Amino acid sequence: MDASPRSRHRRRKSSAHLARLSRSRPRSTPEQIRDFRLNSPRLRLISVWLVLVAGMLGLGSRLAYLQLVIADDLQVIAQEQQAIQATPRTSRRQMVDRQGNVIAMDRVVYTLYVHPMLFKKPSSTIAQSISTVLGLDPKQLTRKFAAEESGIQLSTDISEETAKRLRGLRLDGLDLLPSPKRVYPQSALFSQVTGYIDLEGQPKAGIELALQEQLSYDDPKVGEPTPLQHVTRDDLQMQLTIDSRLQRIAQDNLAKTVAEYGAKRGALLVMDSRTGEILTMAIAPTYDPNKYYDANIEYFRNWAVSDLYEPGSTFKPINVAIALEDKAITATDLVNDAGRIQIGKWPIQNVDYSTNGPRGPISITDVLRYSSNVGMVRIMERLPRANYYEWLEQKLGLGDRTGIDLPGETNGQIKARDQFVGSEVEAATTSFGQGFSLTVLQLAQLHGSLANRGKLVTPHVVRGLTNAEGEITWAPERAAAKQIFSPETTRIVLDMMKDVVNDGTGSAAKLDGYQVAGKTGTAQKATEYGTYGDQRITSFVSIAPVSDPRYVVLAVIDEPQGENAYGGTVAAPLVKKVLESLVVLEGIAPDASSPSSRQQQQQPDANQN
């Protein structure tokens, strides 16, 4: 059906109107068309979405790269930035005594570092939490946190229990760094033997220093810059020859003696003459290696090993053995004790000359029993001085070290050969233990040869590294035993020394049920100018039991005060106390030949009819 005339008229009118508008509007240029398209709202929206999608794709790919490809490397870098890189400390093996009691050990302690840059809670809140565990001032902690972003050291020497409490706070930014700390459970009991480890983890004395290589082992977990770790141990431990039980008895009684006589210092050694094992090495005054920084630096030195002194009369038995071995005397000889003699321009007299005067002809045994200086001069005069010097230097090794496995040992000192051989007085003073010097340890070693049938052994405090089964996997090398006296000579000398204890200057060391050989010593101390002053050094050396000689016990007290301070009054009673414990701990049966034992055997049993 055709459109109505009106409709056709409207279309013609509309077309005409559009034609007029078209003729009146200027035609759009290509640039205008492009601008129109770019400014289209829809197009702008699409562009924004495209940019966002591209960014998200780029970010996603980057995250994937970081998390999947180089995640491990980034973790290492982060740990290096956030953890504290401390100097690694080498772990150390335990030290134990001859019974396996722990003497030194490692314990894990922690150092707390704080990194405020990693806090997820307010600094004041974290400071308050830490202060409740460590007892620190929270206000001061807050100020510290504000001053630095990372690596603040708050506390050291934190125990495992305290470290556990800190971990329980669950705070970000805390870093507990473990390290081994050397601990000495028995405090000052072994300090001059063990030595100590300083705050930097370095050995400074004793076995810790001497056997650094054997005591230390590398633990790769200790010292790494990771927040939490633990210390592992191997099963090796360093076993010493020291007996903790006897050491404590000796140390306690030595300290009492030093205090009672106002002495400068004291030393007490117990040595097994057959093996050279040192059962006791007590020194007074001493120090606690756990708190070495509080001690007098003089106490760090083991003066029984490092310091020289003139042994005095305790060397007389050694001289008698030399004279017997060199055939200069026999056991039945007599010498004239005039009480006072002149050697060149030097007068020599007995300590008791003012009260006892001359004794006249006396036996070699009585020379030792009464500790006669004049008698010893007459004995050693029978030995050519060249021979005497050869004995001292070559056979006894007075100018050498003993070879003990402790640091700081000092060589003994004797005069040059020409000076000794060419001077009558040098041999005379050496005969009663003056004019030369040695260590306390070397004197004990020499008396050990008398107890060990003439064999000189190397004294030592270390048995070696032992494993969990008790097997020795490493031991120090030691010189072979050296025969310096014949067994017959040592038997004769011990019989003489026995009378010193039974009926002589060493009677304070007499032990019920046992025959003890001994010798007292009271020597004037040489001054720095080479003369002798008023100070003295007193000592007593014993060998027990005489029937089966084995143990040497030597006590030396330096500069005791008082008119009655002699070897027989100061050192001999101290040795007796140690001997009483020694025979019990070592299970030494009573000597049947001792007077008290014979009395006990003859006494009837009260239960018998």
Outline where the language-model segments fall.
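Conserved, well-ordered alpha-helix/loop/beta-strand core segments that scaffold catalytic motifs
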Residues: G151, P225-G266
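Second-shell loop/turn segments in exported
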Residues: Q81-A86, Y110-F119, A127-S131, E148-T156, ...
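Beta-lactam-recognizing serine transpeptidase/beta-lactamase-like catalytic domain environment
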Residues: R25, A104, P225-T226, D272-S313, ...
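Short beta->alpha transition motifs characteristic of CBS
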Residues: T90, D106-T111, H115, Y196-D198, ...
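Aromatic-capped interface at the extracytoplasmic side
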Residues: G60-Q85, P227-L228
